[in-house]
């Protein structure tokens, strides 16, 4: 039996473990503070569900492990500075940017990047945290500790957000899912919609960009690339060197889920192109109590993470997929009264994509 240890034991590790069971792969998600002797890592392949981690007895041990897949890639992608430098090195389209070294640079920043600046911490920060949207009169609100530790990007006037989830095998072969349309609110992914066939030009551009990144990094496994849709084409926003929230629809909408695909890639199993037969919608459950009435709707697949429910916390997701988009839209409509009011706008957005 193949064994995989996952650095991190959140919902991504949980879903990787679930995906491993039918394949006969024993998957062990482990907390960062676990005692090394309690973790069966000696004969395991090592992967991670997070981009960065503190130094602990376990992480020190795993950092030396010869089968830690992509070990040297995580630091590059975890730092937005080196991630942006990678895009520039490969001549890949991304928002104009620079390192923000001191407050003295602000006049030049707005001259170069325009009236809206997006400031992001180089490391950490996700789901909208550690980011600021600033105009020239608002720079005083940026914490002093950001200077030297943040990048600043041009605010992009985009018409939509999409992501590409793909995987690369040890032999260099790559496979990709269709582009996923994503709706973020307050920086948090709320809803995703995917179709068997994406826009051909966008799909080709996205695959070329992510393929170049995977090859340059000699990456193995699943990676996600988030992009802005603009009149000139796609601009890369950020990378995630792991399975990704916007790929959760693949659990019920693809012949091979992103979780199974990642395990196949890192363990050297066959990596065929996943087949997608019908449109899919994913609704993130954020700070919402479990409601089994969702399951009264026959298209709904519930994925509950068994986490304490807190405001702003991802605690599960709902997947829906059906070849009949009218039936899919009607099921979304039936979900509205079963969810808190803040879900209505995301469901309306998904329905508009299905038209």
Task: Give the predicted meaning of each segment.
Residues 264-355:
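Peripheral (often C-terminal) accessory segments that flank ATP-dependent C-N-forming ligase machineries
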Residues 204-225, 230, 241-288:
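Active-site "cap" helix and flanking loop/linker of ATP-utilizing ligase/carboxylase catalytic domains
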Residues 1-85, 104:
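ATP-binding N-terminal substructure of ATP-dependent carboxylate-amine bond-forming enzymes
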Residues 78-163, 167-213:
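Active-site nucleotide/adenylate-binding loops and adjacent lid/helix of ATP-dependent enzymes
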Residues 233-235:
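Conserved protein kinase catalytic/activation segment
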Residues 166-170, 227-231, 306:
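Short, low-complexity Ser/Thr-rich regulatory SLiMs
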Residues 187-196, 238-251:
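Short, flexible active-site loops
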